[in-house]
Design a protein with these regions (language model features):
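FIC/Doc superfamily catalytic core
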Residues: 1-321
Length: 321
């Protein structure tokens, strides 16, 4: 089997972002033991699953995903419920997975897509394409070459001297380029990047990078398409490093915000339609405690509600920003 080296260049932006990410990881680790914060783990895992599936057009809200994790019934299309339940099972496998094992990759895909597609946990044996409407924008590697292409990619990953930050982004791009499965490539590729990163720094186990990708979804696909056009992963590496840094900065900010009121305002600035149960889930408080915080913030003119209870949104006043 020939040796394969994915094409990319180390740009000033990649070096700068990698340095800043490493420094931010160190700062977060020094200031707080995230491994000892199970509530944060739970909240971020919910955000990861919700965001990764929302990118794939799953319509369940953050509230509904939270309810499913809590064992509650949700009124939603059954397939979308299965997608969420499967994704939680797949992410729960992270601590036991080897990022250099193709067998483990197949295990993750099986968990992620069980009951959703034929052949879950096996490489595809037919052609596959990525479409924008009716327009084909990317054709995956021909099916007969997929096993060899994946083997070469895993050999490169295990032997590369590239920094894990860069290697994880390269793998993510190459995985999506090959598109080894009939379905579920996006959600599986994003999980595998998390797996590669957590081997470098455990903090990434519960870092919801997927939430940043969802917020910048158009840019995510634009970076993939630009890399395809340029025949190099460089632009995609730069994009993903920006998303990783943004996700880390969110954690860093929360570490420095001690007041529950200010923590709530940060949440509502990021998601103005967040419901009280989800606020409570994020902050580890009861619904009653959240209502008291909201009442206090309203009295201080730091928060107001626009629209109805069902369809409205929260507006954080400018003096609170």
């Amino acid at each position: 089997m020939s040796t394969y080296t994915p094409p990319y260049q180390l740009t000033d932006a990649i070096l700068r972002l990698s340095t800043e990410i490493a420094a931010t990881v160190k700062e977060i680790t020094v200031r707080g033991n995230l491994s000892a914060q199970p509530q944060l783990h739970r909240t971020n895992r919910i955000r990861s699953v919700h965001s990764s599936l929302a990118i794939e057009h799953n319509s369940l809200t953050l509230d509904q995903v939270t309810a499913l994790l809590n064992g509650k019934r949700v009124l939603a299309p059954q397939q979308e419920v299965w997608e969420v339940q499967n994704a939680f099972r797949a992410y729960d496998l992270l601590p036991s997975l080897d990022p250099y094992s193709i067998d483990d990759l197949l295990k993750v895909h099986r968990a992620m897509m069980d009951g959703l597609v034929m052949g879950a946990g096996t490489f595809r044996n037919t052609g596959v394409g990525v479409y924008a409407g009716d327009q084909l924008i990317h054709a995956g590697t021909p099916a007969q070459y997929v096993p060899e292409a994946m083997q070469q990619l895993f050999v490169w990953l295990q032997n590369t001297t590239a920094h894990p930050l860069v290697a994880s982004c390269v793998f993510h791009y190459e995985f999506e380029f090959i598109h080894p499965f009939a379905d579920g490539n996006g959600r599986t590729g994003r999980l595998w990047q998390t797996l590669i990163l957590r081997k470098w720094e455990p903090i990434f186990t519960y870092l919801p990078i997927e939430s940043m990708i969802l917020e910048h979804q158009a840019d995510y696909y634009a970076a993939l398409n630009a890399a395809n056009t340029q025949g190099s992963a460089t632009v995609f590496i730069e994009f993903m490093l920006e998303m990783i840094l943004e996700a880390l900065k969110n954690v860093y900010v929360k570490q420095h915000i001690k007041s529950p009121e200010d923590q709530l305002l940060v949440l509502l600035k990021s998601d103005p339609r967040m419901t009280i149960p989800v606020m409570a889930e994020h902050l580890g408080l009861s619904d009653r405690q959240i209502r008291r915080l909201i009442a206090s913030l309203k009295a201080q003119n730091r928060l107001r509600r626009e629209g109805s209870n069902k369809t409205g949104r929260w507006v954080v006043s400018r003096k609170s920003r």
